[in-house]
């Protein structure tokens, strides 16, 4: 992905990695560990749902291969000599590391705990409420922001409606 970002001169090509990689890696981990227990499939479904929501949100805002995230443009302008290092380490390597570390608990679970024959029903219910609740909060926040940005009267303004009224980043709250 980093090489494609260099070829297209666009570090934003790396952005969908956050959501697309787990959609591919988690099913591979499930297959690799052979942990086809109910709760493992449920965890897979939650990850896929979360990743699908994030990917759709990215696709909605994606303009074309020439569109570069303004933060990357600003970073390159402020630190032109450090840019190659910032690009590979900060924009490409760090997200790869974060996704890898974020998926380690799933690998550990699929490798060990998922072989249990019984499921703690309270744990399942709590996981379902937290997992689905987070995805719902993120989806609602994404929809509210999309609606806000579509209104030409809101150019340059900060969204202070809906979930955004109570939190600067409600979609991140859903992540937690």
Language-model features and meaning:
Residues 1-161, 168-176:
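Membrane-anchoring alpha-helices and their flanking helix-loop junctions
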């Amino acid at each position: 992905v980093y090489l494609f970002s260099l070829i297209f001169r666009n570090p934003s090509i790396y952005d969908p990695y956050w959501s697309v990689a787990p959609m591919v890696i988690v099913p591979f981990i499930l297959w690799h560990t052979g942990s086809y227990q109910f709760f493992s499939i449920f965890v897979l479904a939650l990850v896929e749902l979360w990743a699908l929501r994030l990917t759709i949100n990215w696709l909605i805002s994606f303009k074309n291969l020439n569109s570069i995230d303004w933060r990357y443009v600003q970073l390159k302008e402020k630190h032109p000599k450090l840019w190659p290092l910032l690009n590979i380490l900060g924009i490409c390597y760090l997200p790869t590391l974060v996704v890898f570390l974020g998926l380690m608990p799933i690998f550990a679970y699929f490798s060990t705990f998922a072989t249990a024959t019984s499921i703690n029903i309270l744990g399942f219910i709590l996981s379902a409420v937290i997992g689905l609740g987070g995805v719902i909060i993120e989806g609602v926040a994404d929809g509210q922001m999309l609606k806000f940005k579509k209104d030409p009267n809101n150019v340059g303004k900060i969204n202070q409606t809906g979930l955004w009224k109570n939190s600067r980043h409600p979609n991140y709250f859903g992540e937690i």
